[in-house]
């Protein structure tokens, strides 16, 4: 079979930078799926993307589908011939339709009888006749929420399309993509190199674009180049660039020919909290801030131009002029905000509605304050600081700085709290109340911060469920799933001795009587348990392990986590499989017992050696297990229980549980019930697979 390399490029107007990677990856995934469906073999496939193009390169693509043998089954032999052995009309019609005679047909014997068959050879279709349609289908399936039309073209895409190129080796493949006829024309950089040129071969794409068109089409290469040059530029001025990957991705999606430059701003702006300056540099201008070895912001920034200028100083000056007003705004807001304490802003919270049925932000901070103090008392944190931090927690939302730079909420609250003379615990809690903000973010570790963060999230969860607005499907306008995971992570990762039922009840009490959903507390608990399952599954914990623990309904997250870890460890032990099966057998036996289960074991009724041995082993272990259960040392407890395997196996081998003698039967049921209860102190081991 012959092979060639394939290049498909779509030339467009500037594509949305935050969508560029997803578009390119989806285009590749959709197209390779088409190749697989069409039975077209290929070696590998990669995507390329730049602001004004999406491209795919497939190496060693088969030039045609492989020939196939297709079995075409005809009538049963019993109905294909008459009594004289002559072909029936049905058989002749089938044979004629397949271009053969009845005599040329083969026979196929199955368990349902004997049939006429024809194994027809179907020649594979040439790749070049399939490519354009497959590429169009791949484009049609791209995740584009708001497609647009342009000119007189009825076709829709995320941005106007100007060129389409499909090359199989050196051959131009005829066809259209999004209404644009395939041609060799590829567009270069807007301001450098050739505006457009003819591409002779699929293999020349990257090199020709770079040399002739001044475009680095390989997204990953462009991204790596920006990162390396930015790091070098920062090192030259004695600093380290803050190169967050999401910003690096966005910048790489904005430029075709990256040129890294260093600029500066006036040192007077460093009197403003660095987070506000960084916010405007990164968020508004797409600049990389620079920090010294001590983590202090330097009066410099690194930016990426999309052109090689003969006068880079002019570009640098232009960017400095652009950022200065934004930094001046931050300075003005900071100096203005400092004139008022956070406490003085409390009355203004009454003007901001949190939710129609749940009141204003002032109502919310009052609830947070009380709940945070309640939590702090249980965890040993400073309840006075927790109450104070809870009360002030949303006041920075009323500052000029946060209104303008919304992502600085909490952080600016911390700075303003310090300026107001609040305790450090209160100040830190102002910032950490929102943690974790995203998957992989850290959780607060300070006691007061944990109390306020938990109180805020629980107040929202209980309140929103209380008015019957639980998340439905993918919709989650109040980010309750994130809040729930936050609650669980804060408690688990800090090993806090908190019970969800108690916390939910307290939060519900603080909401008063305006919650209409009488089942809110149960629904919130179920919601948190469901998040527990999802969280542990994401961490690679087996579903059976999670279900085994969930069966015991532990409502203390730290305790839940200890059980998960213990059962995960237990499952790795050699004895776990046999003991899980034994527990399942015990559960099935006990489930059939009518009425209350017997619990008292009479040693005098232990007549069989195997039941005597099991009872003795349980009696030996129970004094050791009791303190382990009390201290939640579940892993050690299950390790000890794993030692019961031989005794349990022997018991089921030698002992008839459901004996005719009622007293013997009940005694053995009591023994099995006792055995099961030891495991149930941790989890329902019978659910392990």
Curated annotation (Swiss-Prot):
What reactions does this protein catalyze?
tRNA(Gly) + glycine + ATP = glycyl-tRNA(Gly) + AMP + diphosphate
Task: State its Enzyme Commission number(s).
Answer: 6.1.1.14
Top class in the EC scheme: ligase
Superkingdom classification of source? Bacteria
Q: Where in the cell is it found?
A: Cytoplasm
Q: Which SUPFAM superfamilies match?
A: HD-domain/PDEase-like (SSF109604)
Instruction: Give GO cellular component annotations, separated by semicolons.
Output: cytosol
Record bears the keyword Repressor:
no
Question: Which BP terms from GO are recorded?
Answer: arginyl-tRNA aminoacylation; glycyl-tRNA aminoacylation
A GO term, aspect molecular function: glycine-tRNA ligase activity
State the UniProt keywords alphabetically.
Aminoacyl-tRNA synthetase, ATP-binding, Cytoplasm, Ligase, Nucleotide-binding, Protein biosynthesis
* Family per record: Belongs to the class-II aminoacyl-tRNA synthetase family.
The cross-references to NCBIfam families, in alphabetical order and at most eight, read: glyS (TIGR00211)
- How does it associate, per the subunit comment? Tetramer of two alpha and two beta subunits.
Q: Any idea what this protein is called?
A: Glycine--tRNA ligase beta subunit
Native organism is Shewanella sp. (strain W3-18-1)
Q: Which gene encodes it?
A: glyS
